[in-house]
């Protein structure tokens, strides 16, 4: 969906929650390399290294603080779109704060389902979305009712099995 939007000259920004860190494989995450090659597609993350729920040496407070920071950043980006003129093409190198056509907030539903951010605040974010913005929320194993009630489009990608369940680590090109 995001690459389709970029292909039509729209600006897209990916804000990832739950993923982050320095000096890790996540610094060279494949999607970041691909995004960097696409004009008009930008990204940032506000996650903590490791994945919430796994033994990564962090606690819920650290993950929650990062997730709440990500939600606050999402609010800023949504607000920036409210006043942006998105009817005409604009500089592909402009920062996301100048407004984007599509904002993808990766893993925000997972963060809400795990109690790292307040689900009501996520719902309020969706309700505050200006008409000129395509807002994409991902993550979670349970779709909150408000998503279905407020969304124009709902799709689902679900895990049937995962290599980590068999003790395999993350695989380059597949998971990062």
Which sequence ranges carry the predicted segments?
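Phosphate-binding/switch loop-helix module in NTP-utilizing enzymes
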Residues: 53-131
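Sensor-1/coupling segment of RecA-like P-loop NTPase cores
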Residues: 127-145
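Short beta-strands and strand-loop turn motifs
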Residues: 14-16, 103-108, 138
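Phosphate-binding/switch region of NTP-binding enzymes
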Residues: 140-176
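Conserved nucleotide-binding/hydrolysis micro-motifs of P-loop NTPases
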Residues: 18-21, 49-51, 109-110, 141-144, ...
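Short, glycine/charged-enriched secondary-structure capping and boundary segments
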Residues: 28-32, 117-121, 150-153, 170-171
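Conserved P-loop
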Residues: 1-83
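Hydrophobic anchor at the start of a short beta-strand
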Residues: 12, 135, 154
């Amino acid at each position: 969906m995001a690459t389709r939007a970029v292909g039509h000259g729209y600006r897209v920004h990916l804000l990832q929650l739950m993923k982050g860190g320095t000096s890790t494989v996540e610094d060279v995450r494949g999607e970041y390399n691909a995004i960097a090659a696409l004009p008009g597609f930008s990204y940032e993350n506000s996650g903590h290294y490791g994945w919430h729920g796994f033994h990564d040496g962090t606690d819920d407070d650290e993950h929650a603080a990062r997730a709440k920071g990500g939600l606050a950043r999402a609010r800023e980006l949504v607000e920036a779109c409210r006043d942006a003129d998105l009817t005409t093409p604009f500089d592909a190198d402009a920062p996301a704060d100048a407004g984007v056509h599509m904002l993808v907030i990766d893993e925000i539903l997972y963060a809400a389902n795990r109690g790292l951010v307040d689900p009501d605040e996520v719902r309020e974010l969706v309700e505050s979305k200006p008409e000129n913005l395509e807002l994409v929320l991902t993550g979670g194993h349970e779709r909150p009712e408000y998503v279905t009630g407020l969304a124009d489009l709902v799709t689902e990608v679900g895990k049937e099995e995962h290599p980590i369940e068999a003790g395999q680590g993350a695989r380059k090109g597949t998971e990062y």
